[in-house]
Amino acid sequence: MGQVFLLMPVLLVSCFLSQGAAMENQRLFNIAVNRVQHLHLMAQKMFNDFEGTLLPDERRQLNKIFLLDFCNSDSIVSPIDKLETQKSSVLKLLHISFRLIESWEYPSQTLTISNSLMVRNSNQISEKLSDLKVGINLLIKGSQDGVLSLDDNDSQQLPPYGNYYQNLGGDGNVRRNYELLACFKKDMHKVETYLTVAKCRKSLEANCTL
């Protein structure tokens, strides 16, 4: 009986520590999701503003080109649809999100479109991406328990953006800006989806469908 009473404080402390870790994990997930939602909204606004400066024919032509082209981050292996996203583990979704955010660290500093919103927010976007990357890395460390490291991720090395856009021709600047903004919007939507699903899984909610 005495041994049981001695074990009770240890079990209580362990329970409190576990609850504290779970609460901290949820707090980090909430911050990460809120930040990527803000980035996604900013990306959508910048893309819409840039489209508004184009003539209708230009907009249609660029949209056709973009649908046939690829984003630089497409080399990062990620779920192809909602079903695959829901089947992916929390750790896998976090790793993909980390790589996607990482892929925008340099391009976010080199966007030089003639758009007042972008000029005002370029530094802010870079800072938010950097903060989000740190936050996702903390979530990965809290989720992996030594199972997988970032170096073990099967994502390929991203090609440099300079090479990606070097052969765009005379209208390359407009096309480059359009593709960068469209890809940024697309990738922030991906990260928002992945982090939202991962957060839901960690909260043990009954329904995490997209």
Swiss-Prot record:
Q: Which family does it belong to?
A: Belongs to the somatotropin/prolactin family.
Checking SUPFAM superfamilies in the record gives: 4-helical cytokines (SSF47266)
- GO terms assigned for molecular function: growth hormone activity; growth hormone receptor binding; metal ion binding
Q: What is this protein called?
A: Somatotropin
PANTHER family given for it? Answer: SOMATOTROPIN (PTHR11417:SF2), SOMATOTROPIN,PROLACTIN (PTHR11417)
Chain's gene name: gh
Q: Which organism is it from?
A: Salmo salar (Atlantic salmon)
- Chief location of this protein within or outside the cell: secreted
The reply on keyword Magnesium is: no
Q: Which InterPro entries match?
A: 4_helix_cytokine-like_core (IPR009079), Somatotropin (IPR034975), Somatotropin/Prolactin (IPR001400), Somatotropin_CS (IPR018116)
Per UniProt, which keywords does this protein have?
Disulfide bond, Hormone, Metal-binding, Secreted, Signal, Zinc
Pfam families named in the record? Hormone_1
* A GO cellular component entry from the record: extracellular space
